[in-house]
Amino acid sequence: MEELVFTFPTDELWKLLPYKKKGLIRGKSEVLKKIVLNGLFLRRSQAEEDPSFKQIISYAIISNEDSFYLFKRTSGQTEKRLHNKFSLGVGGHMNPDDSPESKEQYLMGELRRELSEEVKLLNGCLIEDIEFIGFINDDTIPVGRVHIGLLYNIHVSNKEVYINETDKMTAEWIEKSDLAEFYGRMETWSKIAFDSYII
């Protein structure tokens, strides 16, 4: 059966948010609630080709004090456009959830699921806070016209964070002051997060 992904009508989205062709639109929790209550699931093949809907993607930065967990995607990943690119965020598409959680809890549940797929927290490392930052949009490229990112910062209690799929990516903690060295090879959404949130 084909994957179903969570989407929201593009025209309706820009009635809720100030339009920005490329960049970060600062957090509005009331908009998040409207998205989760009124979004719908579409077949991924349809959603990838239909800019009248935006696929909702969770995109989470992991931080500990003034350090950020920087990912490097390897050639083991299926998405060739991202090979050897650096990324500040983990996340992905949101799929149907059959658990009894309320719709309001759905986004957070999907974010935590994506996080657990990508990394493991060991040796007492705990999530101290999950901060919603805003919406990342990039309508300047075809893939961006059918996606919008929900940018979060996940604050963890120590640096005992490890990659699950080491054949697909590597990662290391980088001090905030050193992140700019990696900017040229960051993927687009990471550049937006860096420009509009981190610096």
Where are the regions a protein language model picked out?
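Nudix hydrolase/Nudix homology domain
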Residues: 6, 44, 84-98, 134-199
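Short, flexible beta-strand-to-coil junctions
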Residues: 8-13, 63-66, 74, 156
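Conserved Nudix-box catalytic region and its N-terminal flanking loop in Nudix hydrolases
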Residues: 67-114
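A short coil-to-beta-strand element that immediately follows conserved catalytic motifs
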Residues: 123-133
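Extracellular structured ligand-interaction cores
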Residues: 3-5, 53-59, 149-151
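Acidic, metal-coordinating catalytic segment for phosphate/diphosphate chemistry
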Residues: 20-67, 73-77
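Short, extreme N-terminal leader segments that mark the start of a protein/domain
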Residues: 1-25
